[in-house]
Every structure is written in C-alpha cells, then in structure tokens.
Swiss-Prot record:
Domain of life from the UniProt record: Bacteria
Keyword annotations of the record: Cytoplasm, FAD, Flavoprotein, NAD, tRNA processing
Homology family: Belongs to the MnmG family.
Subcellular location: Cytoplasm
Residues where FAD binds: 9-14, 120, 175, 364
Residues binding NAD(+), per UniProt: 267-281
A GO molecular-function annotation: flavin adenine dinucleotide binding
Gene: mnmG
GO biological process, one term: tRNA methylation
Function according to Swiss-Prot or TrEMBL: NAD-binding protein involved in the addition of a carboxymethylaminomethyl (cmnm) group at the wobble position (U34) of certain tRNAs, forming tRNA-cmnm(5)s(2)U34.
GO CC terms in record: cytosol
Principal location listed in the UniProt entry: cytoplasm
Protein name per Swiss-Prot or TrEMBL: tRNA uridine 5-carboxymethylaminomethyl modification enzyme MnmG
InterPro entries: FAD/NAD-bd_sf (IPR036188), GIDA_C_N (IPR049312), MnmG (IPR004416), MnmG-rel (IPR002218), MnmG-rel_CS (IPR020595), MnmG_C (IPR026904), MnmG_C_subdom (IPR047001), MnmG_C_subdom_sf (IPR044920)
Amino acid sequence: MIYDSIVIGAGHAGVEAALILAKKHNTLLITGSLKQVASLPCNPSIGGPAKGVVVREIDALGGVMAKAADLAQIQIKMLNSSKGPAVRALRAQIDKLEYPQIIFEILQKTLNLTLLEGLVNNLVIQNNQVQGVCLIDGTKINAKTVIITTGTYLASQILIGDTKKSSGPNGVPTTYGISTQLKELGFEVIRLKTGTPPRVKKNSIDYSQTKIQMGDNLEQIFSFVPQTNQRPQEPCFLTHTNQTTHQVIQKHLNQSAMYGGYVEGTGPRYCPSIEDKVVRFCDKNSHQIFIEPESLSLDEMYLQGLSTSMPQHVQHEILKTIPGLQNAQITKYAYAIEYDAFNPNQLKHSLETKKIQNLFLAGQMNGTSGYEEAACQGLMAGINASLKLQNKPPFVLKRNEAYIGVLIDDLITKGAKEPYRLLTSRAEFRLLLRHDNADLRLKDYGYQLGLIDEKDYNNFQNKKAKINLLLEKSKNYEILVNSDNLSYLKQQKSASLGEKTTLAQLLKRPELNFCTLQHFLQEKADKTIYEQVEIQIKYEGYIAKAQKEAQKLARLEQKKIPSKINYADIKNLSKEAQEKLDLIKPQTLGQATRILGVNQVDISILLVYLEKHHALL
C-alpha cells in the first residue's frame, strides 16, 4: 500500500499536518508513543503575546489547536488588555492530561488517517525525491509525500547537572537515523537546547507568601467556533527569587549543565534558565516565578521562570530560598534537553526542502520554540503537501496577512542559530495582524482550500455582513446636540458637543468604546462584533497607513528573481551578499531585502541587474 502522505511525529506540528492531510488524502501518522500524542512536556500553557494570535490563525485555517485549548483550559486571560489591539493576545493554562486526550480522540475519529506507534530509522529517497520511510524493525512504508515533525526527539539528550541521558521528553526514546541521513545528504544540522523547571506538590506550597493571579472573569476563547467549557477558573500564584537565591545559584554555577560545559546546543534567548538570568541580568535583585496548575487531575504545580539544569540537590537548595516554596516537595526535577534541528533556510516557503522533493519539515526541528509555532508550521506543511499531491501551487501567507507568514518568512530568509520565538515586534504590520481579526484575514483562504465546512463559513459570512452593517450605520448615524446625548457624554466623562457629529466620529474619542455603539445603535449583535467595529473606526487612520506600507512591500514581492540566476555574475554585488543570496535563493526582491548581510546598496544593484537582464533570464 502507498500512502498519499506520511507524517513522522505526533506533537503539535504533526497533529495539525495529519488532520489537514486526512481531509483529502490517505495519511499515516507515525509516533514513538501513542500515549504522548500532542503532549505538553515543556509548560502547561498555550498562547501569549503573538503566539495567542497564531492559535486563532490556525483556527481560521481549519486547524484544531484552538478548539482543543478551549476545551482543556483551566484558566484564560487576555494579555495587554489595557493596551492597544495590536498587542493583545490570549494565554491559557491548559490541563496537560486533558488536552492530549482531546486531540487523540479527534485523531481516532478522523477518516483517512491511520495511527502507528513506531520509530522511523530512515527515509526512502530516490533521485532526490522521497518515496517513503523505513522503521527500525525494517518495515518499509511507501508514500508520495513525507512530513517530518520530530520536535526535540532527534538525537536528544536530557541533562541534569553533569549527568546526560539519551532520551526525549517524558521518557520517549530518541532517534538518530533521520538526523544522520539528512546530514549525509548535505543538510545543515544545528544543535539546540531548551529546558523546563521543576514541578512541586500543590499542598507543599505556602500560598500565604505568594500573590494570587486569577484569570479573566469575562468569557474568553481562542476558537471562532465556541466550545463548551463551563468549569471555574483555577488560580495561579506569583512569587520571586531574591538575593539569597542568586547567591545559591552563583555558588553552584559550575555544576549547571549549561555553565559546566556539558551543553553543546544553543538555548532560547527569550526563555532563559534561572542561572542564565542571574548571570545575564546581574543587576536585578529578583525574578518572577509563576506557580501554575498542570492539571485538575494532578497534585502538581509548574514553576514558570525557574527552568534550570542544576543538579537535583541544588534544585532543592534553590527552592528553600524562595517565599512560599521553602518546604515545596519536588515531584519532577528540572532538566535541560538538547537536540538536533535543521537550519530552516534549507526550506522553501511551502516548508518543502530545497534538496529533496516532496519532503517537508515542520515544527521545533526547524529551529523554533513553542507549541504554537510548531502547530502553525505543521498546518502549513500539511496544506502544502496536500496541494503538491493535487498538482496545485503552494499556499504561502504574506507578512502582512498573518503572524504565520511572518514566522515562516523569518525562518526561510534569516535561518536560525538559536530557538526562534515569535514576538509582536517581529511583525512590521502588527496592527493588521490582530487577535480580533484573524478570521477576517484568513477564513476565506481556509474555505477556498476546503478546510472550513459550509456551516462555519456561513456563520462567518453573517458575521462579516453584520460588521459592515454596523460600520455603515455608525458613519451615517447623527448624534444631535440635545439634553439626552449631552447627559450621556457627561456620564462617560467625555467632552460636550458643540455641533452635531456622526457616531463614528464620536467613537474616535479615546474614553469611549463599543458600549457607546450599543447605546446608540441598539442592534442585536455579539460583543465581539461591536468590538470589531470599534477597532476599525478608532484606528482607521493607523490601519490605512499600515495597509499603504504593506502595498509598498507587495510591489517588491511582485519582482520575481529567476531561480537560475548566478549572483557571481552581478558586478559590484558584495561578496557577502553573493554568498547569502546564493544560499537562501530568494524568490522575490522583497524577500532578498530581509536577508541578513544583504544591504540596501546590494538590493539596488540587484534591481538594476534584474531590470537590465530580465528578458535574458
């Protein structure tokens, strides 16, 4: 039997890829452990700045992460709610036992999808085209396309102090064959590191020495299709390290796997270990530690901010210095994990490899960190593998269309030498890439690709129509200077009116919000629809400016660079630019502008060359 596609690895990337492919194709999902499908080994949360928006983008394109997160969340909060809409995002505490179970049940019910527990030893490749896989027991399985989503399980090692153990997270076996094979085929393999903090017993914490952190009372969800989850929100708690903590860490610094020279891999810049924080930010007297629930079914709390690779006895010593954790009982020790990954500049924007046809890479093995970054790559790899099977062109999101587009373009164009984390600051057009409008940006694509069902799409069309109706009414609704309106504005602590105005003009006042729309229009509509109308009116000028800038970028993206161009032939192009352009092989002039080592002079020279030799190329 020949499968249309094989997905290797059932983490967050593999799950999204397999579910997308199975909508149209016969798909095999291979995992080292069916008990660890979509597991949360690093932290029990989904979302955060930029990442929460990605979860909504995944949902708008037909992915599953948002729906499962809504069902499994035990606390949810809108971050940056007091700031502008460009930086708002949801973050949820997730029940680490319930979430994988929800995903596993979805996989089991999915038609065209076969689940197989096993380890892949190597790929079957002929004439630079993948043909299938071989398992470690010698079984050969043929497929037309293959997606590798092995996360942190390639040649992985667990490190605690000076001890090393060959293993993936949660005791799942590591694998070496794929990494070795791709290295032999000329792929650049990079060594990366991440880590996780200790877990402690709930009832061993003195919560009176901590500050409680509650979720939002208002109902918040990731998915645009509401899921039922009526349970109460679980609290988190905040404590801090102190100078005594830092003295303990400094005293034992050379015993850390990181500072003792036992780690080869590069760690994440934006999620450093506690020993890294103490060394890098030595002027700070304390660091935050969030105490978070891992599951309603576990007597265990996660200590966010205390990731470390210190020996076990030092971990105990560290906890004894932290308020509320002096008597905490460790249920699972912190550790670092290093693993093989692949520099993503070896991929096309479709996430297909440049060297091997029909082979796609997605997730943490592409040098990213985070469940959300992995899931969106799996989704896009699944979509593009499906399109390849249908002989259709790839689907590539632009930087002004989605954070997913920003992430993939950054990876392909700039590569990765350390774990890449998506940040709002990485997006030039973050006012366009908001939490609230992910469906307005992407759901049409999802429907066109056959990933959104008719009922969902009809509901979306009705939502769009309602938004447009309220926008039009707001622009035409006249606010007269009368006692009722003046009294209302006074109640809202807003300036009086000197002459009549429109509701849209009135709403541009910073102290007024969607409640003003509801007060005057009296239209029946969800709060989210009113909020969308408010944002589009209040930030109209800024949004128009961002759209104008995006159009400028689009013009550069339309200038294609022939694949057969020889950069060595271009006179006056710097040596570094020649090397970088030849390595990345940008498809457009816009992409070339974002390559590190290619400056504006190089771009001007390249543009002149392309215009002069266009007919010959």
